[in-house]
């Protein structure tokens, strides 16, 4: 007969009328009982032949993600002119006096940030903008291109001008070496000259006038900065041949090559690969009058393209280098010919724009390393778009980068730190990631861009032929004309005006500030904000400032104090170049909303929207149907967040964890579902731990247990010998139930860790409820007053220790001096799930 929910509650000792704990609790450690209950609740995970369920409510498996919806009216968010003060350490020292070693180390990490991937795979430009919305290809192309342009204008991206130079807007940093020697002309004259050449994005651009002279005088490709990482000998010798192929799939990401060391004969010998590339490009871009390939020493090898006579009528007209402007002189092919649109304006503006500053960069191929697409800014704001950058190549495969770990405050530390009677407000840092500058050496690895409208459309429309490889004939200009394209462009013309022309050109951009799609970025942001908060706390001793990523909170004793504090801190942050969004400052009163929790003087609880999600999840959870383990991962993710607030905590979810580990489907029995549902219906706050003196001690041997409560000693025996960890856990439970003390001394590390997931399942669930809110202090066995009673010696009375307990705030503690993390030691901070062996999602 299946186990009823009421009976199951009685087994777990969750009901009031349970028998004496000393008799009932050891039974829960019995393997036979655990096995029988697991069978009754269908937790044995037999291989199921019924088809698995792949969707539960909003939860779907990892391989069936929700389809994003395209919004043609997305607004591109505006970015302030973010420029973090380069001398940020001195600025802070003027404000608070000398910084600690820890703060300096963290601030130095991001000024500038560096990125050294193991290998970089270059992708063709067509993959620059992902065809995420097949029904809105053109619209998505222009919206994304506009977003990239906005980022470039805000100084967040570099624009690749040539193989070795880039331009950007905004204020330069000292590590960005400006090009001189007449390499680029300044002001309007330069713009005039550039637009005369109609060069596009440096993909086929003319070499800078002085680049060849300059390269002879420069020792390294990044100047003095980069000489810290010299190339090893073998690499130096080979670098010429390695760097000859633009699209070599992998290459050493760091190192310096002396550009002046190679001679002109190298260029000649390498022109074969240039010719090949040039031929490919001729075919793809037939109308450029000049192609060149920059050899790795900065000289340009030029090939002049004579329009072939086979092109027919096209060769009779003057050849434009711009696909868009060619339509002006062509006969309309239909009512939907693009020439109608192009003839609407006399002046379409320049083919390309250049930034105010030009710098040298390491050799950067005309490729991208990640695709981009747009999505809603967040579930609550669908009016604005957000750019998603896919640099997942750095997190995959054999050459994946293992990103540095960093301390995330756990719930108890957070509650100890923030649960108080302070008034709170949270600050919103606008575009937090885009505050932290990247070294230009990272540019070749973090490239985004687009192939230009003509190739993008041609690739996506199956009926158009891009190229006739056999005969080398030019594609017909009007191949891309279609009703859909014409209508889309006409509508976009209202939005973008003459910028349509600029955006239809190919472009390659590299990140100048840290992008969101790389695992290094969250680490750097966390280091940066924690250092800044540390400085703020020392500058304002009566204030509590705390941050996690870009979420910064300030607490003070009174509302008036908080307001004056807010003004001072805001001014300080602005003086460092940190941009705050005053409209999004939230005043919380005495209950702070932070990291998904509501934290008040009573402790912490999950925020309301999470509780609603959990109720929703249980409402839609099917019974007696095998659920795909990937969906179980999603369910456990949600329930695991709120587990510390339930009676039985993480142990209650162990059957689900086990099914995920074994990659089996999981079937919820009505009783197990009812049990979980009840668990999550009543949530209990996690309270702040209080300091105190330990008066109660517990100890156990495999056969018996002993307690020391004040001057009283107690002992008992188990019916059968138990594993030592289980015996110690039982002793701690008896100590809590007998004395009611919230502070217990024990010599067992597993009990101290308060993770009861490795014990027999029923015992883990019951112990979690009995020991909820209990703090443990470590006492060495030799000094443990409960050691003698546990061995059956009641007459011997050891003196009670004075063991003070100080609640921990973990690595997040206010003045924690965290030493630098040596790379060869195991991680000190684990994101372990409650399992002993943390499972990694596949």
From Swiss-Prot:
Alphabetized Pfam families for the sequence: DNA_pol_viral_C, DNA_pol_viral_N, RVT_1
Gene Ontology BP annotations: DNA replication; symbiont-mediated suppression of host innate immune response
Top-level division of the source organism's lineage: Viruses
Chain intervals for the UniProt region annotation (Disordered): 186-273
Gene Ontology molecular function terms on file: DNA binding; DNA-directed DNA polymerase activity; metal ion binding; RNA-directed DNA polymerase activity; RNA-DNA hybrid ribonuclease activity
Keyword DNA-binding: yes
Key words, A-Z: DNA replication, DNA-binding, DNA-directed DNA polymerase, Endonuclease, Host-virus interaction, Hydrolase, Inhibition of host innate immune response by virus, Inhibition of host RLR pathway by virus, Magnesium, Metal-binding, Multifunctional enzyme, Nuclease, Nucleotidyltransferase, RNA-directed DNA polymerase, Transferase, Viral immunoevasion
E.C. designation(s): 2.7.7.7, 2.7.7.49, 3.1.26.4
Region Terminal protein domain (TP), residue ranges: 1-177
Residues binding Mg(2+): 428, 550-551
Positions of the UniProt region annotated as Spacer: 178-345
Region (Polymerase/reverse transcriptase domain (RT)): 346-689
Activation and inhibition: Activated by host HSP70 and HSP40 in vitro to be able to bind the epsilon loop of the pgRNA. Because deletion of the RNase H region renders the protein partly chaperone-independent, the chaperones may be needed indirectly to relieve occlusion of the RNA-binding site by this domain. Inhibited by several reverse-transcriptase inhibitors: Lamivudine, Adefovir and Entecavir.
Site label Priming of reverse-transcription by covalently linking the first nucleotide of the (-)DNA, positions: 63
Reaction(s) catalysed (UniProt annotation): DNA(n) + a 2'-deoxyribonucleoside 5'-triphosphate = DNA(n+1) + diphosphate; Endonucleolytic cleavage to 5'-phosphomonoester
Miscellaneous remark of the record: Hepadnaviral virions contain probably just one P protein molecule per particle.
Entry's free-text remark on domains: Terminal protein domain (TP) is hepadnavirus-specific. Spacer domain is highly variable and separates the TP and RT domains. Polymerase/reverse-transcriptase domain (RT) and ribonuclease H domain (RH) are similar to retrovirus reverse transcriptase/RNase H.
Family: Belongs to the hepadnaviridae P protein family.
Name of this protein: Protein P
